[in-house]
Amino acid sequence: MSSAAPIVCLAGPTAAGKSAATLALAQRWPLEVVNVDSATIYRGMDIGTAKPSPAEQARVPQHLLDIRDPAQSYSAAEFRADALRLIDEIRARGRMPLLAGGTMLYYKALRDGLDDLPQADPALRAELEARAARLGWPALHAELARLDPATAARLAPNDSQRIQRALEICTLSGQPMSALLHGRQRAADATPHRYVTLSLEPSDRAALHARIAQRFDAMLAGGLLDEVRALRARGDLHPGLPSVRCVGYRQMWAHLDGAVDLETAREQAIAATRQLAKRQLTWLRAQPERLVVDCLAGNASGRVVDRVAEILAD
Protein backbone atom coordinates (compact mmCIF):
# COMPACT_ATOMS: atom_id res chain seq x y z
CA MET A 1 0.00 0.00 0.00
CA SER A 2 1.49 3.34 -1.09
CA SER A 3 2.57 5.66 1.72
CA ALA A 4 0.96 8.48 -0.27
CA ALA A 5 -2.48 6.85 -0.26
CA PRO A 6 -5.03 8.53 1.99
CA ILE A 7 -5.94 6.79 5.21
CA VAL A 8 -9.62 5.97 5.55
CA CYS A 9 -11.28 6.73 8.88
CA LEU A 10 -14.46 4.67 9.13
CA ALA A 11 -16.45 6.64 11.67
CA GLY A 12 -20.04 7.02 12.75
CA PRO A 13 -22.24 6.96 15.82
CA THR A 14 -22.61 3.91 17.98
CA ALA A 15 -24.78 1.17 16.40
CA ALA A 16 -24.23 2.53 12.88
CA GLY A 17 -22.78 -0.73 11.56
CA LYS A 18 -19.06 0.02 11.49
CA SER A 19 -18.10 -3.56 12.37
CA ALA A 20 -20.10 -5.05 9.49
CA ALA A 21 -18.63 -2.50 7.08
CA THR A 22 -15.12 -3.35 8.27
CA LEU A 23 -15.64 -7.03 7.47
CA ALA A 24 -16.91 -6.11 4.00
CA LEU A 25 -13.83 -3.97 3.38
CA ALA A 26 -11.56 -6.82 4.49
CA GLN A 27 -12.99 -8.98 1.71
CA ARG A 28 -11.76 -6.44 -0.84
CA TRP A 29 -8.42 -5.22 0.55
CA PRO A 30 -5.65 -6.71 2.74
CA LEU A 31 -6.37 -4.40 5.63
CA GLU A 32 -5.59 -4.18 9.31
CA VAL A 33 -7.82 -2.25 11.68
CA VAL A 34 -6.57 0.37 14.11
CA ASN A 35 -9.43 0.68 16.57
CA VAL A 36 -10.37 4.24 17.50
CA ASP A 37 -12.35 3.38 20.60
CA SER A 38 -11.73 4.38 24.21
CA ALA A 39 -13.76 1.43 25.56
CA THR A 40 -12.53 -1.59 23.59
CA ILE A 41 -8.99 -0.93 24.86
CA TYR A 42 -10.00 -2.56 28.16
CA ARG A 43 -9.56 -6.25 28.89
CA GLY A 44 -12.58 -8.02 30.34
CA MET A 45 -15.00 -5.51 28.85
CA ASP A 46 -16.25 -7.33 25.78
CA ILE A 47 -20.05 -7.41 25.77
CA GLY A 48 -20.84 -3.82 26.68
CA THR A 49 -18.25 -2.42 24.27
CA ALA A 50 -19.46 -4.53 21.32
CA LYS A 51 -15.88 -5.67 20.90
CA PRO A 52 -15.22 -7.71 17.74
CA SER A 53 -15.72 -11.40 18.44
CA PRO A 54 -12.78 -13.83 18.34
CA ALA A 55 -14.07 -15.05 14.96
CA GLU A 56 -14.14 -11.49 13.59
CA GLN A 57 -10.67 -10.82 14.97
CA ALA A 58 -9.44 -13.97 13.25
CA ARG A 59 -10.76 -12.68 9.90
CA VAL A 60 -9.29 -9.17 10.19
CA PRO A 61 -6.16 -8.24 12.16
CA GLN A 62 -7.16 -5.78 14.90
CA HIS A 63 -4.99 -3.37 16.86
CA LEU A 64 -5.55 -1.45 20.11
CA LEU A 65 -7.96 -3.99 21.56
CA ASP A 66 -7.42 -5.31 25.11
CA ILE A 67 -4.32 -3.17 25.69
CA ARG A 68 -5.23 -1.87 29.16
CA ASP A 69 -6.53 -3.26 32.42
CA PRO A 70 -9.75 -1.49 33.51
CA ALA A 71 -7.85 0.02 36.46
CA GLN A 72 -5.54 1.86 34.04
CA SER A 73 -6.03 4.98 31.96
CA TYR A 74 -5.19 5.63 28.31
CA SER A 75 -4.81 9.13 26.98
CA ALA A 76 -5.37 10.70 23.59
CA ALA A 77 -1.62 11.32 23.46
CA GLU A 78 -0.94 7.61 23.94
CA PHE A 79 -3.48 6.76 21.25
CA ARG A 80 -1.89 9.19 18.81
CA ALA A 81 1.58 7.72 19.32
CA ASP A 82 0.29 4.16 19.03
CA ALA A 83 -1.80 4.88 15.92
CA LEU A 84 1.01 6.64 14.05
CA ARG A 85 3.37 3.76 14.83
CA LEU A 86 0.81 1.18 13.71
CA ILE A 87 0.05 3.00 10.46
CA ASP A 88 3.73 2.84 9.52
CA GLU A 89 4.05 -0.81 10.56
CA ILE A 90 0.95 -1.88 8.63
CA ARG A 91 2.09 -0.10 5.48
CA ALA A 92 5.55 -1.63 5.84
CA ARG A 93 3.84 -5.03 5.63
CA GLY A 94 2.22 -3.98 2.34
CA ARG A 95 -1.22 -3.83 3.89
CA MET A 96 -3.86 -1.13 4.26
CA PRO A 97 -4.45 0.58 7.61
CA LEU A 98 -8.11 1.30 8.39
CA LEU A 99 -8.97 3.53 11.31
CA ALA A 100 -12.36 2.48 12.65
CA GLY A 101 -14.33 3.55 15.69
CA GLY A 102 -16.31 6.30 17.31
CA THR A 103 -14.04 8.07 19.83
CA MET A 104 -13.90 11.47 18.21
CA LEU A 105 -11.29 12.87 20.61
CA TYR A 106 -8.85 10.26 19.31
CA TYR A 107 -9.49 11.27 15.69
CA LYS A 108 -8.97 14.91 16.64
CA ALA A 109 -5.67 14.15 18.37
CA LEU A 110 -4.46 12.17 15.37
CA ARG A 111 -5.41 14.77 12.77
CA ASP A 112 -4.64 17.99 14.61
CA GLY A 113 -1.88 17.09 17.02
CA LEU A 114 -2.04 17.78 20.73
CA ASP A 115 -2.15 20.91 22.80
CA ASP A 116 0.99 21.64 24.77
CA LEU A 117 -0.72 20.96 28.11
CA PRO A 118 0.59 19.18 31.23
CA GLN A 119 0.60 15.41 31.03
CA ALA A 120 -1.76 13.47 33.27
CA ASP A 121 -0.57 12.96 36.83
CA PRO A 122 -1.78 9.60 38.21
CA ALA A 123 -1.52 10.65 41.86
CA LEU A 124 -3.43 13.89 41.32
CA ARG A 125 -6.01 12.09 39.20
CA ALA A 126 -6.57 9.53 41.96
CA GLU A 127 -6.97 12.33 44.49
CA LEU A 128 -9.59 14.07 42.32
CA GLU A 129 -11.46 10.81 41.80
CA ALA A 130 -11.50 10.17 45.55
CA ARG A 131 -12.86 13.65 46.21
CA ALA A 132 -15.51 13.17 43.54
CA ALA A 133 -16.55 9.86 45.09
CA ARG A 134 -16.96 11.65 48.41
CA LEU A 135 -18.46 14.99 47.32
CA GLY A 136 -19.85 14.35 43.83
CA TRP A 137 -18.74 15.80 40.50
CA PRO A 138 -21.03 18.87 40.79
CA ALA A 139 -18.96 19.96 43.81
CA LEU A 140 -15.77 19.69 41.78
CA HIS A 141 -17.49 21.54 38.93
CA ALA A 142 -18.21 24.37 41.38
CA GLU A 143 -14.54 24.39 42.36
CA LEU A 144 -13.57 24.58 38.69
CA ALA A 145 -15.98 27.51 38.25
CA ARG A 146 -13.95 29.45 40.82
CA LEU A 147 -10.60 28.57 39.22
CA ASP A 148 -11.54 28.66 35.54
CA PRO A 149 -15.02 30.15 34.93
CA ALA A 150 -14.72 30.00 31.14
CA THR A 151 -14.03 26.26 31.07
CA ALA A 152 -16.62 25.47 33.74
CA ALA A 153 -19.29 27.37 31.80
CA ARG A 154 -19.06 24.97 28.86
CA LEU A 155 -19.03 21.77 30.94
CA ALA A 156 -22.00 20.00 32.48
CA PRO A 157 -21.76 19.50 36.27
CA ASN A 158 -21.48 15.73 35.80
CA ASP A 159 -18.99 15.77 32.90
CA SER A 160 -16.51 13.95 35.11
CA GLN A 161 -13.74 13.32 32.61
CA ARG A 162 -13.46 16.92 31.41
CA ILE A 163 -13.89 18.43 34.88
CA GLN A 164 -11.13 16.16 36.14
CA ARG A 165 -8.79 17.14 33.31
CA ALA A 166 -9.47 20.88 33.71
CA LEU A 167 -8.78 20.76 37.46
CA GLU A 168 -5.68 18.70 36.81
CA ILE A 169 -4.36 21.31 34.38
CA CYS A 170 -5.14 24.18 36.76
CA THR A 171 -3.28 22.43 39.57
CA LEU A 172 -0.24 21.35 37.55
CA SER A 173 0.23 24.55 35.55
CA GLY A 174 -1.05 27.15 37.97
CA GLN A 175 -3.13 28.60 35.13
CA PRO A 176 -6.71 28.11 33.92
CA MET A 177 -7.03 25.68 31.03
CA SER A 178 -8.95 28.31 29.06
CA ALA A 179 -5.97 30.67 29.24
CA LEU A 180 -3.56 27.98 28.12
CA LEU A 181 -5.77 26.96 25.21
CA HIS A 182 -6.20 30.56 24.12
CA GLY A 183 -2.52 30.78 23.24
CA ARG A 184 -1.99 27.11 22.50
CA GLN A 185 0.64 25.68 20.23
CA ARG A 186 -0.04 22.42 18.48
CA ALA A 187 2.59 19.73 18.49
CA ALA A 188 5.26 20.45 15.92
CA ASP A 189 5.22 16.87 14.65
CA ALA A 190 1.94 17.23 12.77
CA THR A 191 0.80 14.02 11.17
CA PRO A 192 2.33 13.36 7.74
CA HIS A 193 -0.79 11.55 6.54
CA ARG A 194 -3.95 12.61 4.77
CA TYR A 195 -7.07 11.28 6.47
CA VAL A 196 -10.45 10.93 4.78
CA THR A 197 -13.47 10.43 7.01
CA LEU A 198 -16.07 8.01 5.71
CA SER A 199 -19.02 8.44 8.01
CA LEU A 200 -21.90 6.04 8.52
CA GLU A 201 -24.83 8.28 9.45
CA PRO A 202 -28.58 7.66 9.80
CA SER A 203 -31.12 9.28 7.50
CA ASP A 204 -33.68 8.67 10.25
CA ARG A 205 -32.61 9.41 13.83
CA ALA A 206 -35.54 7.43 15.27
CA ALA A 207 -34.42 4.32 13.42
CA LEU A 208 -30.93 4.66 14.90
CA HIS A 209 -32.49 5.03 18.35
CA ALA A 210 -34.40 1.79 17.79
CA ARG A 211 -31.15 0.07 16.80
CA ILE A 212 -29.48 1.37 19.95
CA ALA A 213 -32.23 -0.04 22.16
CA GLN A 214 -32.18 -3.40 20.36
CA ARG A 215 -28.42 -3.64 20.63
CA PHE A 216 -28.40 -2.83 24.33
CA ASP A 217 -31.10 -5.41 25.01
CA ALA A 218 -28.97 -7.94 23.12
CA MET A 219 -26.02 -7.03 25.35
CA LEU A 220 -28.14 -7.64 28.44
CA ALA A 221 -29.28 -10.98 27.04
CA GLY A 222 -25.66 -11.80 26.22
CA GLY A 223 -24.46 -11.38 29.80
CA LEU A 224 -23.58 -7.70 30.27
CA LEU A 225 -24.77 -7.66 33.86
CA ASP A 226 -22.56 -10.63 34.72
CA GLU A 227 -19.63 -8.93 32.99
CA VAL A 228 -20.10 -5.81 35.14
CA ARG A 229 -20.62 -7.97 38.23
CA ALA A 230 -17.24 -9.63 37.61
CA LEU A 231 -15.52 -6.26 37.24
CA ARG A 232 -17.15 -5.00 40.43
CA ALA A 233 -16.12 -8.14 42.33
CA ARG A 234 -12.44 -7.37 41.71
CA GLY A 235 -12.55 -4.77 44.46
CA ASP A 236 -10.04 -2.38 42.89
CA LEU A 237 -12.40 -0.67 40.44
CA HIS A 238 -14.78 2.19 41.15
CA PRO A 239 -17.15 4.53 39.26
CA GLY A 240 -14.52 7.27 39.05
CA LEU A 241 -12.41 5.29 36.58
CA PRO A 242 -12.74 5.92 32.81
CA SER A 243 -13.46 2.22 32.25
CA VAL A 244 -16.38 2.11 34.67
CA ARG A 245 -17.70 5.42 33.31
CA CYS A 246 -18.20 3.83 29.88
CA VAL A 247 -21.81 3.96 28.73
CA GLY A 248 -23.69 0.88 29.85
CA TYR A 249 -21.14 -0.06 32.48
CA ARG A 250 -21.79 2.85 34.80
CA GLN A 251 -25.56 2.29 34.67
CA MET A 252 -25.25 -1.44 35.40
CA TRP A 253 -22.75 -0.65 38.16
CA ALA A 254 -25.29 1.71 39.76
CA HIS A 255 -27.88 -1.05 39.60
CA LEU A 256 -25.53 -3.50 41.32
CA ASP A 257 -24.85 -0.84 43.95
CA GLY A 258 -28.58 -0.82 44.65
CA ALA A 259 -29.09 2.74 43.43
CA VAL A 260 -31.65 1.84 40.74
CA ASP A 261 -33.62 -1.20 39.60
CA LEU A 262 -32.58 -3.05 36.46
CA GLU A 263 -35.27 -1.56 34.21
CA THR A 264 -34.30 1.98 35.25
CA ALA A 265 -30.64 1.19 34.64
CA ARG A 266 -31.54 -0.18 31.22
CA GLU A 267 -33.49 2.96 30.32
CA GLN A 268 -30.66 5.19 31.55
CA ALA A 269 -28.08 3.24 29.55
CA ILE A 270 -30.13 3.48 26.36
CA ALA A 271 -30.68 7.22 26.91
CA ALA A 272 -26.95 7.74 27.54
CA THR A 273 -26.12 5.82 24.36
CA ARG A 274 -28.48 8.05 22.37
CA GLN A 275 -26.77 11.12 23.83
CA LEU A 276 -23.39 9.68 22.88
CA ALA A 277 -24.60 9.11 19.31
CA LYS A 278 -25.83 12.70 19.14
CA ARG A 279 -22.43 14.04 20.23
CA GLN A 280 -20.66 11.80 17.73
CA LEU A 281 -22.87 13.03 14.88
CA THR A 282 -22.40 16.67 15.87
CA TRP A 283 -18.63 16.24 15.71
CA LEU A 284 -18.72 14.36 12.42
CA ARG A 285 -20.89 16.93 10.68
CA ALA A 286 -18.32 19.61 11.46
CA GLN A 287 -15.53 17.75 9.66
CA PRO A 288 -14.25 19.47 6.50
CA GLU A 289 -13.48 16.36 4.44
CA ARG A 290 -16.23 13.85 5.10
CA LEU A 291 -18.03 11.39 2.88
CA VAL A 292 -21.36 10.04 4.09
CA VAL A 293 -23.05 6.68 3.66
CA ASP A 294 -26.56 6.21 5.03
CA CYS A 295 -26.15 3.47 7.62
CA LEU A 296 -29.85 2.60 7.29
CA ALA A 297 -29.74 2.07 3.53
CA GLY A 298 -29.90 -1.37 1.99
CA ASN A 299 -26.41 -2.82 1.50
CA ALA A 300 -24.78 -0.01 3.47
CA SER A 301 -21.60 -2.08 3.79
CA GLY A 302 -21.43 -2.48 0.01
CA ARG A 303 -21.77 1.28 -0.39
CA VAL A 304 -18.89 1.76 2.04
CA VAL A 305 -16.75 -0.53 -0.12
CA ASP A 306 -17.61 1.52 -3.21
CA ARG A 307 -16.75 4.81 -1.49
CA VAL A 308 -13.44 3.49 -0.22
CA ALA A 309 -12.57 2.38 -3.76
CA GLU A 310 -13.26 5.94 -4.92
CA ILE A 311 -11.11 7.40 -2.13
CA LEU A 312 -8.15 5.17 -2.96
CA ALA A 313 -8.47 5.88 -6.69
CA ASP A 314 -8.54 9.65 -6.16
UniProtKB/Swiss-Prot annotation:
Family affiliation: Belongs to the IPP transferase family.
Gene3D superfamilies according to UniProt: 1.10.20.140, P-loop containing nucleotide triphosphate hydrolases (3.40.50.300)
Taxonomic source organism: Bordetella petrii (strain ATCC BAA-461 / DSM 12804 / CCUG 43448)
Sites where the protein binds ATP: G12, P13, T14, A15, A16, G17, K18, S19
First and last residue of the signal peptide: none
One GO-annotated biological process of the protein: tRNA modification
InterPro entries: Dimethylallyltransferase (IPR039657), IPT (IPR018022), P-loop_NTPase (IPR027417)
Self-association and partners: Monomer.
UniProt keyword list: ATP-binding, Magnesium, Nucleotide-binding, Transferase, tRNA processing
Catalytic activity field: adenosine(37) in tRNA + dimethylallyl diphosphate = N(6)-dimethylallyladenosine(37) in tRNA + diphosphate
E.C. no: 2.5.1.75
Protein name from the UniProt record: tRNA dimethylallyltransferase
